[in-house]
């Protein structure tokens, strides 16, 4: 039976993959986007692109009318420059608007995509059960995503059918290339390395995950998840490695001689914050001070959702093929 799913952030890397997979399995998709003209490939496969702003509750409700459930992908991501008010509007108010629409329109479930930057991953428990850090990073991205996470789970505790998914470092092909290659994306970092333009990058462990896996995991959470739970949508445990190491593996697979060097966040805190932004600096600092609990292949997310991500080599291979088809490398 065909269902109608409301997707926010439909032109973003994850959102576009979610829309594509929902269409491929026979669902109707209503996607809230700022500019429908940006995504002709989504319209071509049958996605109903509805113009609107995630920060406007009336826009969100109008776009969500008739939907049976929602996957909330829209977010403002951390970059070198971060204005708290902008992040509050998108990551907090936007999430509230989607949750309100889900409740008021009687949706069966809302899946909200979150992040892992505020969890204590060295607490000796699985990531799905990890507590929030006593002193989480105070960059605008983390602050606002944590507030949104808390709202989702407060609503779940009050009886709403809502849950969160927590992706790692997302990369891979998309039907909306210019959005998938946004300067703050891991795709852009990988492309820079493949072009020999990324000399070094902050050193911290990266849970590389293909966008198509994040999409399939989010859809599985919609179908098989449990209200109030959270799911860790990352790559395989053996593929966790620094950004430089991930870039270097991409270069090896593509036959590119360039190599990226790891960069210690302590070498120039002020300069590196200006270059990489407060979110990545906070992640690097937290990682250097913590002992992470090793991720197991048998984990709550895999057991509940049947989530089995592809290997980093497979994902990078798909990315390289896509970039070549686009004429980027």
Segments (PLM) and residue ranges:
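Conserved Rossmann-fold NAD(P)-dependent oxidoreductase catalytic core, especially the SDR/UDP-sugar
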Residues: 93-141, 163
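Active-site Tyr-X1-5-Lys
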Residues: 138-163
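Substrate-positioning beta->alpha
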Residues: 182-185, 200-222, 229
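NAD(P)H-binding glycine-rich loop region in Rossmannoid oxidoreductase-like domains
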Residues: 37-43, 47-93, 101
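NAD(P)-dependent short-chain dehydrogenase/reductase
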Residues: 161-164, 168-206
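Mid/C-terminal beta-alpha module of Rossmann-like enzyme folds, strongest
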Residues: 217-283, 312-313, 317-329
